[in-house]
Design a protein with these regions (language model features):
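Extracellular/virion structural assembly segments
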Residues: 1-148
Length: 148
């Protein structure tokens, strides 16, 4: 891992896209068939107001450290780094959730995590998103890439 994306300057707007390779075909009778490849990744596009050279320098230097597409890094957009819900406390996974699961039993929270919130488990590099509001059972996408 090549570090974390600079937190300053802050982007004016951010677009997050989920990329999930899917094969889709049509039969001769026009029935649609779809198959998932099982992978997923996020792409993020950030737009900045015009910056001076000094303001842009941390972003430029970080981009160069990545050596094109070689580097891997983390990025927490300020607007998305906290839940949009009322959850407080420490999320504890009850365990026994396997790769491929998309429903995760947990406890330790008071309040609610909201659909669209992002979550990362301590033992994972992968970031997941909640597909519904949650208090004790998290519905996530993509499904777990490895056990938690």
């Amino acid at each position: 891992m090549s570090g974390a994306y600079p937190t300053t300057p802050v982007a004016d707007s951010i677009k997050i896209t989920s990329i999930t390779p899917t094969l889709v075909s049509l039969t001769h009778s026009l029935k649609r068939q779809a198959r998932s490849r099982g992978g997923q990744r996020w792409t993020i596009s950030a737009t900045y107001a015009p910056l001076s050279r000094a303001e842009f320098a941390p972003i430029w230097a970080f981009a160069q450290q990545q050596r094109g597409q070689y580097g891997i890094f983390t990025y927490q957009p300020p607007i998305y780094k906290d839940t949009s819900g009322t959850a407080t406390g420490t999320l504890l996974v009850n365990g026994g959730d396997s790769a491929g699961d998309s429903s995760i039993a947990c406890d330790g929270l008071t309040g609610t995590l909201k659909a669209g919130d992002f979550i990362k488990f301590a033992s994972h590099d992968k970031v997941y998103t909640l597909t519904s509001d949650a208090t004790t059972t998290l519905a996530i996408e993509p499904p777990l890439m490895s056990a938690v």
